[in-house]
Design a protein with these regions (language model features):
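Bacterial N-terminal signal peptides that target proteins for export
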Residues: 1-9
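Bacterial N-terminal signal peptides
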Residues: 9-18
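N-terminal secretory/targeting leader peptides
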Residues: 10-11, 24-116, 125-128, 132-325
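Sec/Tat signal peptide C-region and signal peptidase I cleavage site
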Residues: 17-25
Length: 325
């Protein structure tokens, strides 16, 4: 009888210790972004959150907050330092507010195409720039997702740079995003991403710029007449882990987070490429006019009017990116 009691007590203690350990070990994390639930950036984030839970045996419970639920893009970047979010997806243009050199990728016509961008993410110059960001902020860029080539949508036809003169255009309040529109004479307005559709609809602005996939997902095509293939920025998003969380992760968990997030970014990148290829025909079917432009003319205008130093970029970094094959 005593032996049985001892066995039962030992088993109960072991179960209690296991339950306590599991309870103490599980961390609840917040992952935030500004994109719609239908977009690959969200679906891949949800997959990654679930996969991290599986691979860590439930030590992490990650909730994903899409569509600016935890704030605009500037807010969630600030949230990494405030501790209100643990993981975000965000462009290097926002990272550049803390470490300007990393924003050089947004200088218009830096990348030839998506493959050039993806090759850059495996280069030494990428490692140097992301390390500079981490040294400045403590936050760790763990993965990069292709966002798409940024083009212009407008209610005014645009065939040459000068056609943009006086155009009321929504552009994010990011110096490099502003470079091409301002070089061509547009009047820019920094309207929040969540408010762009209404601003286009009510005429507050006549135009905006984004990848084709975003123009489709946010339904901007419903309130625009023209798609102009300016192709001025080959854009990307960073998956960033807060410095506070990164410090707490064991080496084993760092590897799991990194592997899963890079797998997720590869999934989203693949989807974006496929979707992007279909959208020119989609917009034509919706009755929009799609216009090709001479990119050399636009690029030359930007280079003549916009210095790297004015953005606190380093031309040496840009030259290194140009050399990436």
């Amino acid at each position: 009888m005593l032996k049985k009691l001892t066995v039962v007590m030992a088993a109960s203690a072991a179960a209690l210790m296991a339950a306590t350990s599991a309870g103490m070990a599980q961390a609840k994390l917040k992952w935030a972004h500004v994109y719609e639930t239908s977009e690959p950036f969200h679906t891949s984030s949800v997959w990654a959150a679930q996969e991290i839970g599986k691979r860590t045996n439930g030590r992490y419970a990650i909730d994903v907050y899409p569509a600016s639920q935890l704030g605009k893009e500037a807010d969630i970047n600030q949230g990494l330092s405030l501790g209100s979010v643990d993981i975000i997806i965000s462009g290097s243009s926002f990272a550049a507010k803390s470490f300007p050199p990393i924003g050089v990728t947004y200088y218009p016509y830096t990348f030839r195409d998506a493959d050039h961008l993806l090759a850059y993410t495996k280069s030494d110059v990428f490692k140097d720039l992301t390390k500079g960001y981490e040294d400045k902020t403590g936050h760790h860029i763990v993965a990069v997702t292709y966002y798409g080539v940024r083009h212009t949508s407008s209610n005014r036809p645009i065939k040459v740079c000068a056609d943009m003169k006086g155009l009321k255009m929504r552009v994010p309040d990011v110096p490099a995003y502003l470079a091409m529109p301002r070089a061509c004479g547009a009047n820019t307005a920094p309207i929040a991403f969540a408010e762009v559709y209404l601003a286009l609809q009510n005429g507050t602005v006549e135009a905006q710029e984004n990848p084709l996939t975003t123009i489709e997902a946010k339904k901007f095509y419903e309130v625009q007449k023209h798609i102009v293939l300016t192709g001025h920025i080959v854009d990307h998003l960073n998956t960033i882990i807060s410095g506070e969380l990164w410090k707490k992760l064991s080496e084993e968990d760092r590897k799991i987070f990194t592997d899963v997030m890079q797998e997720a970014s590869a999934k989203a990148t693949g989807e974006i490429k496929v979707n992007e290829a279909k959208l020119v025909d989609f917009f034509k079917q919706k009755g929009l006019t799609v216009t090709e432009i001479n990119k050399d003319e636009f690029r030359d205008t930007v280079i003549k009017t916009t210095s790297f130093e004015s953005f606190d970029y380093r031309k040496a970094d840009w030259d290194r990116i140009q050399a990436v094959k």
